[in-house]
Amino acid sequence: SKMTLYRVATNSKIVEALIEAAENGKDVVVLVELRARFDEENNIEWSRRLEEAGCRIIYGLDNLKVHSKLCLITRKIGNAISYITQVGTGNYNEKTAEIYTDYSLMTARSEIGMEASRVFNALCMGQTIKHTEYLLVSPHCLQNHVADLIDREMEKAKAGQPAYIALKVNSLTDKYLIDKLIAASQAGVKIDMIVRGICCLIAGIPKKTENITVRSIVGRYLEHTRIYIFGAGNDAAVYIASADWMTRNTIRRVEVGAPIYDNDIKARILSMFRTMMQDNVKARIQQPDGSYKKQSASSSPLNAQEYFYAQAYAA
């Protein structure tokens, strides 16, 4: 089992499970990021406990924070190797999980597992992966892949085909990607963005960003999911990731995003994004002057967080 840890709870059941796995004779490799702000002391203490239990510990990289949420379980039965890969948008932390909204994908697809294995092999050598086919992995294989996906939508728009980009992040400050989004808007791509915090793009500017909408949802739970959607309809390319679209995430950190191949999961994410776009209680819509406006009271109010909460409890 291999895992990256950024922020963990003070009494972490995740770390206890890793310790138990190592004590049961499993081969456990844990990358602990010691520079997680305000959690340095906690992470040092857990590293010591993990090492004592027989886990192999890697202490991040010299010049890059490892912010990814990646776990890989490798099983060898005879000569056959199988993988279970988990990629998430949120930390392995029970305390923050109570109040943050996040997505987590678990997949047995071998191509994802093999690529995740390459990511860990590079990290174990103090390096970063330079090429990926499936996963989005910064600092080398996230920004450029995202730019290619934006270009693909621009080509569709220019050919008169439906073109769409949807994005949900905590912050948008990466100038290169902002410029790509502006170019896509000018090419006729419809773009919807849910950006909770800092957003350095102003939507609704004629001839620049008139095809872009930006809204921020601030509710009872901290919006923390990162979703990238490229394409209109069910054939859209959908990713979940640990990375915001900030230069610190795309260039100065190790982040991982995963494609969603399962049609049911993809449909669920698309549906949830549409619901968030319809939120008229906690969503504030960015105006062309950069201000955010709450929507006027509706006869049918929709609070997306409450809606998802009710759905989860009805399941």
Per-region residue spans from a language model:
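PLD/PLD-like phosphodiesterase catalytic module centered on the HKD motif
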Residues: N24-I84, G88-N91, T96, E111-G113, ...
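Short hydrophobic/aromatic-rich motifs at helix boundaries and adjacent loops
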Residues: A17-E20, V119-L123, I150-M154, S242
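Gly-rich Lys/Arg/Thr-decorated short loops/hinges at beta-loop-alpha junctions or inter-strand turns
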Residues: G126-L135, G160-P162
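Mobile "lid/hinge" segments at catalytic clefts and subdomain interfaces of large enzymes
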Residues: Y92-M125, I269
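A short acidic, amphipathic alpha-helical/loop segment
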Residues: K13-E20, L177-L181
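Active-site-adjacent structural elements in folded domains
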Residues: V8-E16, K168
